[in-house]
């Protein structure tokens, strides 16, 4: 996948701020610090398209990125960050739910989880939310380079078991360090935006 264009378009907190365009949208969701920004930067072959931060909970808006004039990535706020106030978390929740359930351009969601650990309660809640609303989902298990190759199957099985993963969904093991899983991620994303056309 050759990336000729990858640019930040705008940030939004409400539907009247969403950019007007005709591209299919793919949202990226996951726990704070799961590696969403690193995932976006790596698959788009850019060093700082999405800002990475050592401070969890940094993304507080819906951030729209135009990729090749073909896809609009939408980075949604990371969830599960304890140091953000309850009011702030609820505000994010409403913003995300509003976007995920009402945006007609949305073709699906890339849900990022950390392959090293069992998915959190928040991860399971998000996966169930997407299944409930019949929003197509790709589960991307990040930080693949942090576990031994001999342990991969065990970790993948644990993630799937905890999520009660639906085999009709796509699962990609991914490393932003080595780019392993990058091609598989693009294949899954393209399948998402071309299904039902």
Swiss-Prot record:
Question: Which of UniProt's keywords are assigned here?
Answer: Cell cycle, Cell division, GTP-binding, Magnesium, Metal-binding, Nucleotide-binding, Septation
Q: Which residues does the record give as GTP binding sites? A: 30-37, 57-61, 75-78, 142-145, 174-176
Chain positions recorded as Mg(2+) binding sites: 37, 59
Cofactor(s) of this protein: Mg(2+)
The disulfide bonds in this chain are none
Q: Name one GO cellular component term.
A: cytosol
Q: Where is the EngB-type G domain?
A: 22-195
Q: Which GO terms describe its molecular function?
A: GTP binding; metal ion binding
Q: Which domain of life is it from?
A: Bacteria
Function according to Swiss-Prot or TrEMBL = Necessary for normal cell division and for the maintenance of normal septation.
Q: What is this protein called?
A: Probable GTP-binding protein EngB
Organism encoding this protein: Exiguobacterium sp. (strain ATCC BAA-1283 / AT1b)
| Gene name in the database record | engB
């Amino acid at each position: 996948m050759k990336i000729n264009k990858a640019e930040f378009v705008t940030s939004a907190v409400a539907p009247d701020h969403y950019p007007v365009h005709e591209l299919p949208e793919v949202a990226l969701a996951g726990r704070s610090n799961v590696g969403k920004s690193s995932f976006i930067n790596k698959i788009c072959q850019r060093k700082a398209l999405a800002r990475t931060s050592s401070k969890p909970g940094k993304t507080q808006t819906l951030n729209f990125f135009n990729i090749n004039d073909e896809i609009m990535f939408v980075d949604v706020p990371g969830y599960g960050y304890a140091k953000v106030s309850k009011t702030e978390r609820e505000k994010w929740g409403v913003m995300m739910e509003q976007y995920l359930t009402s945006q007609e351009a949305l073709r699906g969601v890339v849900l990022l989880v950390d392959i090293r650990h069992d998915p959190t309660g928040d991860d399971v809640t998000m996966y169930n939310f997407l299944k409930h609303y019949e929003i197509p989902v790709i589960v991307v298990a990040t930080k693949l380079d942090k576990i031994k190759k001999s342990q991969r199957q065990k970790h993948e099985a644990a993630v799937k078991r905890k999520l009660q993963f639906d085999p009709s969904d796509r699962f990609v093991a991914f490393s932003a360090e080595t780019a392993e899983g990058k091609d598989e991620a693009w294949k899954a994303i393209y399948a998402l935006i071309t299904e039902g056309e």
